[in-house]
């Protein structure tokens, strides 16, 4: 809507006059008949529902949706699975939650919002839907050696520890840099998960805990897990590269804790600790391995400039020691400081060797009853072979463009005007108008002082009469 225009003009004659008082109008409510004929627009949402309903790149991503089931899994990219039922630890036949004995997974706080960081649902349906121990129907024995560890229970501990470690790592780095790319994390997560599944298939349910492990579980362990047996070290590094001696090992490690009620141990994974080859060894003898992350060279979330060999690591948290780009330049010794002053333009004046008179001037030409500037240059008076005088004005440039080049004719008007001006009428060369090159024009020559103007006027009169 355009602004209101002033109703009367304010001048020096009516500035002291009072303005007429305007009455303020009031709004009136329109009747129902008028409102029926009016089109009332209402705001509507363009995208109704969640983004995954309408498709897109994250169509299958259900991580931000609260699981509808009472318990179970909701993985990194799938929907909620079925709750685990029928899991026992060998001493009781009651149904238990999948990770009741893991403290780190008791109250899961998701890195993506409100979903539990656990394994994918396909793993639940295939592998651990309802595993049971071989001796679940036998009465429990009082001896510590009679109770056997279920392979599914050990698998659950590894899976829970892996999930919790990935969750903590993601929370830490997402809080630091929310724009980081998490795609490679899930690819490596699948590799570790496949390794755990392979161990579950190869290990079977025949592994048992010895009395030595039972005795060391309650006291302060000499190693990280409290296991007195040396396991063969077989760390898994990302992209299949072996751990380098020069690089620091950032490993998933597990701390063993005693569980009096279940008679089993719970494992929690952590980053940044160097462990021995007996990592995860107390859960099952010889079938479990440690998960190591090489802090080698190229990394998604940082890079180690001191590492020379290219062992890739996607979870390397070591900050880069060298800048990523070369945007900033360092001052070196011996460099010349830049001068803020602009470079001076050096003009080489074109000299006329045979000129007997030269003077700086500014040339104007008359057009439409006003003088317009032609340029600044040097006026030269030169003798010719026909005993006439040539008036030449060259511009003060390196090229020395010719502004005016005429002969002083006997009938050429030449007058002294103004303070320091000399007025002549001639046919300009080069012409001012290419369509009418022979049309005479009035040229005004302005010099620095009045004495210079008098001298120039005197010389022009002498040469004109000669």
Swiss-Prot record:
Ranges for domain RanBD1: 333-466
Binding to CDKN1B: annotated segments: 143-205
N6-acetyllysine: residues carrying this PTM: 8, 82, 126, 448
KO phenotype (gene knockout): NUP50 targeted disruption results in a complex phenotype characterized by neural tube defects, exencephaly, intrauterine growth retardation, and late embryonic lethality.
Keyword Ubl conjugation: yes
Modified residues (Phosphoserine): 52, 208, 234, 268, 294
Tissue expression as described in the entry: Widely expressed at low levels. Highest in the developing neural tube and adult testes.
Disordered as annotated region, ranges: 1-22, 128-150, 200-257, 316-343
Biased composition (Basic and acidic residues): 1-14, 241-257
Record's keyword terms, sorted: Acetylation, Isopeptide bond, Membrane, mRNA transport, Nuclear pore complex, Nucleus, Phosphoprotein, Protein transport, Repeat, Translocation, Transport, Ubl conjugation
Disulfide bonds: none
Source species, domain of life: Eukaryota
Comp. bias intervals (Polar residues): 131-150, 225-235
Residues annotated with Phosphothreonine modification: 246
Localization annotation: Nucleus, Nuclear pore complex; Nucleus membrane
One GO cellular component, as annotated: nucleoplasm
Listed InterPro entries: NUP2/50/61 (IPR015007), PH-like_dom_sf (IPR011993), Ran_bind_dom (IPR000156), RanBP1-like (IPR045255)
Stretches for region 5 X 2 AA repeats of F-G: 76-302
Covalent cross-link Glycyl lysine isopeptide (Lys-Gly) (interchain with G-Cter in SUMO2), where: 351
GO biological process, any: neural tube formation
Major localization listed first in the record, in broad terms: nucleus
Its biological purpose: Component of the nuclear pore complex that has a direct role in nuclear protein import. Actively displaces NLSs from importin-alpha, and facilitates disassembly of the importin-alpha:beta-cargo complex and importin recycling. Interacts with regulatory proteins of cell cycle progression including CDKN1B. This interaction is required for correct intracellular transport and degradation of CDKN1B.
Subunit relationships: Does not interact with TPR. Interacts with Importin alpha-2, Importin beta, Importin beta-2, NUP153, Ran binding protein 7, CDKN1B and itself.
Matches recorded under PANTHER family: NUCLEAR PORE COMPLEX PROTEIN NUP50, RAN BINDING PROTEIN
Protein name per UniProt: Nuclear pore complex protein Nup50
Annotated source species: Mus musculus
Gene assigned in the entry: Nup50
């Amino acid at each position: 809507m355009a602004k209101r225009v002033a109703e009367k003009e304010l001048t020096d004659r009516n500035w002291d006059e009072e303005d007429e008082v305007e009455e303020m109008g009031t709004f009136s409510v329109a009747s129902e008949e008028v409102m029926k004929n009016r089109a009332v627009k209402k705001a509507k949402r363009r995208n109704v529902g969640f983004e995954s309903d309408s498709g897109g790149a994250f169509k299958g991503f259900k991580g931000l949706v609260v699981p509808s089931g009472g318990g179970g899994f909701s993985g990194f990219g799938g929907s909620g699975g079925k709750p685990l039922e029928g899991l026992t630890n060998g001493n009781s036949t009651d149904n238990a939650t999948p990770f009741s004995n893991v403290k780190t997974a008791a109250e899961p706080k998701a890195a993506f919002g409100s979903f539990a960081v656990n394994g994918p649902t396909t793993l639940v349906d295939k592998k651990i839907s309802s595993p049971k121990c071989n001796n679940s129907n036998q009465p429990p024995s009082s001896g510590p050696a009679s109770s056997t560890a279920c392979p599914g229970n050990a698998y659950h501990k590894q899976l829970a520890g892996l999930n919790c470690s990935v969750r903590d790592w993601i929370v830490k780095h997402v809080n630091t840099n929310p724009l980081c790319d998490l795609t490679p994390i899930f690819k490596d997560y699948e590799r570790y998960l496949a390794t755990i599944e392979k161990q579950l298939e190869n290990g079977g349910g025949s592994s048992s805990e010895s009395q030595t492990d039972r005795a060391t579980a309650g006291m302060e362990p000499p190693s990280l897990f409290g296991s007195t047996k040396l396991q063969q070290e077989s760390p898994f590094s990302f992209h299949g590269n072996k751990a380098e001696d020069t690089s620091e090992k950032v490993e998933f490690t597990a701390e063993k804790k005693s569980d009096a009620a279940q008679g089993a141990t719970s494992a929690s994974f952590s980053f940044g600790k160097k462990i021995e080859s007996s990592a995860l060894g107390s859960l099952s003898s010889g079938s479990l391995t440690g998960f190591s992350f090489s802090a080698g060279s190229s990394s998604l979330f940082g890079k180690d400039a001191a590492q020379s060999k290219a062992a890739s690591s996607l979870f390397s948290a070591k900050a880069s020691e060298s800048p990523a780009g070369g945007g900033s330049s360092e001052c070196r010794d011996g460099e010349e400081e830049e001068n803020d002053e602009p470079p001076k333009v050096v003009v080489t004046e074109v000299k006329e060797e045979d000129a007997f008179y030269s003077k700086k001037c500014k040339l104007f030409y008359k057009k439409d009853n006003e003088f317009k500037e032609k340029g600044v240059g040097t006026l030269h008076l030169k003798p010719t072979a026909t005993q006439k005088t040539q008036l030449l004005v060259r511009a003060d440039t390196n090229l020395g463009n010719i502004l005016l080049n005429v002969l002083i004719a006997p009938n050429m008007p030449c007058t002294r005007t103004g303070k320091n001006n000399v007025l002549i009428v001639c046919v300009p060369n080069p012409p001012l108008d290419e369509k009418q090159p022979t049309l005479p024009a009035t040229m005004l020559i302005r010099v620095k002082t009045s004495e210079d103007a008098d001298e120039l006027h005197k010389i022009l009169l002498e040469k004109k009469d000669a």
